[in-house]
C-alpha cells in the first residue's frame, strides 16, 4: 500500500477491499514514522534538490510525514485484511516498529532493499522466529550472504530473497 492511502484511513481500507477483489493473497504496509526514519532538517542530504525529481524542494522528513501509515491504523488495516481473506503484513524500519508489529502478531516480515544491510534490524526480526521476505536491492553478494547468515543464526529458517529494482 505504501503511502497510497494519502493519509486517509477510509482510503486505506478501500485499498484493502480492492486488493482482495482483484485476487491478491496479501497486502503489505510499512511501519515507521518520520522521526524513526530521519531527522527534521531542510538542507544537505536531507533535502531534495534534483530538478528531475518528483519531490524537488521537499525534505525527507516532510516526505515521510506525508507517506507514513499511522500506527493507530495498523490494527484496522490488518483486521480488514482478515475479513477479506488476505494476509496483512508489514515492513519494519527500526526496533520500535518490530516490537509494535509483534504486538499485532503479524505472520511474517518484509525487509526493504535499503534495510537489507541493517544487520541489527535483521537480527531483531529473525529473533521473532517468523518468516522473512527480503528485497535484494543493490546489495552485493557478500552483503546478501551476511543477511542470510544473520537471519539463520538468529532463528529465521524461512527466508525468501526477492530480486528488485532500487531505483524508479
Where are these regions (language model features)?
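Short, small-residue-enriched loops and turns at beta-alpha junctions
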Residues: 4-5, 34-38, 66-67, 116-117, ...
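Glycine-rich, proline-tolerant flexible connector loops at the mouths of alpha/beta enzymes
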Residues: 7, 25-68
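Catalytic domains of carbohydrate-active enzymes, especially glycoside hydrolases
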Residues: 14-33, 104-105
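Conserved, mostly hydrophobic/aromatic
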Residues: 19, 101, 135, 161
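Short, well-ordered coil/turn segments that N-cap beta-strands
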Residues: 23-25, 82-88, 105-107, 128-130, ...
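Hydrophobic faces of well-ordered beta-strands that scaffold small-molecule active sites
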Residues: 27-29, 88-91, 109-111, 132-134, ...
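Active-site beta->alpha loop and helix N-cap motifs at the rims of alpha/beta catalytic domains
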Residues: 51-119, 141
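Catalytic alpha/beta core domains of metabolic enzymes, predominantly
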Residues: 139-168
